[in-house]
Curated annotation (Swiss-Prot):
Protein name: UBX domain-containing protein 1
Organism of origin: Saccharomyces cerevisiae (strain ATCC 204508 / S288c) (Baker's yeast)
Phosphoserine carried by residues: S128, S210, S224, S315, S321, S322
Listed Polar residues bias regions: 69-79
Coiled coil: none
Length: 423
């Protein structure tokens, strides 16, 4: 038999809270940690089922003993009544006969009333011991699971009632209810303990010497932050009609066999790391919301700010994305350069040209220059393929400018804005 690593044994003991011998026994039998854990959890579930069956059998035995004792008492009472009713006075005693007649006359109506009252049942103001036993038996019958049978002539199938009170889900909710009540009663004590633990001293100190000449030694705190226990977190689990949900996460359906492991872990007081998104050894507080009579409702999407990419408005061609923005610390060469004051301005008018690549330029020219001159200037300064066709357009309203010998004044382009667009 291969030797089992100590790390595996310690991990099994931490997950199951068992002794070292039991951990070694399971790991030696199965060899793998996961298989050993599954076998241990299955045995624990079987033990719980056996204990429930034993408790149910004990209740049935107690009920049978009570019914037997009640029937014995009833028969004894009937015998005593017949014996008392059979008593008669001596023939020679008048006093005894008178007392007998008086007793008979005073007590004869009462048994009639009592018999009618006990026969009706609903009109009785008192409950007998038999009524109590009968009511308890009815309650026990209601608590028992109802199983039905289905099938044909040669085959049969036993179907268990899904509303079994001993089911895993009901057991889990009942434990959560009891745990919530205990937490409410002991809540203040836990808060005080937490505050006392938070005020503990941490840091470094001085070690006192044993001799007179011994120097003081500084002792550092070697406890790393990674080895300390993670902070306590809170998780919310909602149980719907179809399944259960952790916070606003996805729905874990009851009919999925993979999710039964999570229910079993929660029922045994352990927190599934993947389900609750916690670390190993981290303390977690689980708040349970019971909504078994409601269907699952998907969480509404939270409204937030805009995120993503967009298109720059006013691009030369609809649908064409604008070039990437230039960092602020860099000045592109294509940007418009302010003209120095000492440079003389040429021409009697100016036209602002907006190129398709985002560059802007202010062209000083004469009003007698032609539109064709403007096209040639844009072609030579566009820094693109000269063979690519384009058009010059008015800024507003947007309409193309004809490339002809019309003067800038006649084309109404004096002190205007011209936009370049690719053809």
């Amino acid at each position: 038999m291969a030797e089992i690593p100590d790390e595996t044994i310690q991990q099994f003991m931490a997950l199951t809270n068992v002794s070292h011998n039991i951990a070694v026994q399971y790991l030696s039998e199965f060899g793998d940690l996961n298989e050993a854990l599954n076998s241990y959890y299955a045995s624990q579930t079987d033990d719980q089922k056996d204990r429930r069956e034993e408790a149910h059998w004990n209740r049935q035995q107690e009920k049978a003993l009570k019914q037997e004792a009640f029937s014995t008492n009833s028969s004894n009472k009937a015998i005593n009544t017949e014996h008392v009713g059979g008593l008669c006075p001596k023939p020679g005693s008048s006093q005894g006969s008178n007392e007998y007649l008086k007793r008979k006359g005073s007590t004869s109506p009462e048994p009639t009333k009592g018999s009618s009252r006990s026969g009706s049942g609903n009109n009785s103001r008192f409950m007998s011991f038999s009524d109590m036993v009968r009511g308890q038996a009815d309650d026990d019958d209601e608590d028992q699971p109802r199983n039905t049978f289905a099938g044909g002539e040669t085959s049969g199938l036993e179907v268990t009632d899904p509303s079994d009170p001993n089911s895993l889900l009901k057991d889990l909710l009942e434990k959560a209810r009891r745990g919530g009540q205990m937490g409410a009663e002991n809540g203040f004590r836990d808060d005080e303990d937490h505050e006392m633990g938070a005020n503990r001293f941490t840091g470094r100190g001085f070690r006192l010497g044993s001799t007179i000449d011994a120097a003081d030694e500084v002792v550092e705190d070697n406890t790393s932050q990674s080895q300390r226990r993670p902070e306590k977190v809170t998780r919310e689990i909602t149980f719907w009609k179809e399944g259960f949900q952790v916070a606003d996460g996805p729905l874990y359906r009851y009919d999925d066999p993979a999710n039964s492991f999570y229910l079993s872990e929660l029922n045994q007081g352990r927190a599934p790391l993947k389900l609750l998104d916690v670390q190993f050894g981290q303390e977690v507080e689980v708040n349970v919301y019971k909504k078994l009579d409601e269907s699952y409702k998907a969480p509404t999407r939270k409204l937030g700010g805009f995120s993503g990419q967009g298109q720059r408005l006013g691009s030369p061609i609809p649908g064409e994305s604008s070039p990437a923005e230039v960092p602020k610390n860099e000045t592109p060469a294509a940007q418009e350069q302010p003209m120095p004051d000492n440079e003389p301005k040429q021409g009697d008018t100016s036209i602002q040209i907006r190129y398709a690549n985002g560059k802007r330029e202010v062209l000083h020219c004469n009003s007698t220059d032609t539109v064709k001159f403007l096209y040639e200037h844009v072609t030579s300064n566009a820094n693109t393929d000269p063979s690519r066709n384009f058009t010059l357009n008015y800024a507003f309203p947007i309409k193309p400018i004809s490339n002809d010998e019309t003067t800038l004044k006649d084309a109404d382009l004096l002190n205007s804005v011209v936009v370049q667009r690719w053809a």
